[in-house]
């Protein structure tokens, strides 16, 4: 299908040329963010305009994008948390022999060291890190389920070929850097 290859090539050529002005104007008219960008991309890729959104619902685009953004945010939090733990560990080591007073129930208790107290703070962050890594390792895309969770738009696109439909979510997950979809 020469036509298909031309359409794909045209989209690849313009994949990073986001025409925000056209999308913004179109959104004023249709009040739909995804379809406004589909329209703007279609203006840049006239050969591909008819296939840009083929099979994909707006929920497919928006919901999966939200998961991708959340995943990127979790990566940033993870990096910062690891750095905080490393700095607290250095602080604890530096002050491991500096005496201070420990508290329990906001009442003075017994002598300890600043370093020991810092290890307790660090432990809290280590538990947070463990939880964060669990969330990151189990995060999944929503996949191609669409608005109603049935993949109806893709079933229609592929003439009800369930075998093909079953291959879509693993492909989407792999392409987006995830292990799987729901």
Label for each model-derived stretch:
Residues 157-159:
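Short coil/turn connectors between adjacent alpha-helices in alpha-solenoid helical repeat scaffolds
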Residues 1-2, 175-182:
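Short, intrinsically disordered, charge-balanced linker/junction segments flanking boundaries
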């Amino acid at each position: 299908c020469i036509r298909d290859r031309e359409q794909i090539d045209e989209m690849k050529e313009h994949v990073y040329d986001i025409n925000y002005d056209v999308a913004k104007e179109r959104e004023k008219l249709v009040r739909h963010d995804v379809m406004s960008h589909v329209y703007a991309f279609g203006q840049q890729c006239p050969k591909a305009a008819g296939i840009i959104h083929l099979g994909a619902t707006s929920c497919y685009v928006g919901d999966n994008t939200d998961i991708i953004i959340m995943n990127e945010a979790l990566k940033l939090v993870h990096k910062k948390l690891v750095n905080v733990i490393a700095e607290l560990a250095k602080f604890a080591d530096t002050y491991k022999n500096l005496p201070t007073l420990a508290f329990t129930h906001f009442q003075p208790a017994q002598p300890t060291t600043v370093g020991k107290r810092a290890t307790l703070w660090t432990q809290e962050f280590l538990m947070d890190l463990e939880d964060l890594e669990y969330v990151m390792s189990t995060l999944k895309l929503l996949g191609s389920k669409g608005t109603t969770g049935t993949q109806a738009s893709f079933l229609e696109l592929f003439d009800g070929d369930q075998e093909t439909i079953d291959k879509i979510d693993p492909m989407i997950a792999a392409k987006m850097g995830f292990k799987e979809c729901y």
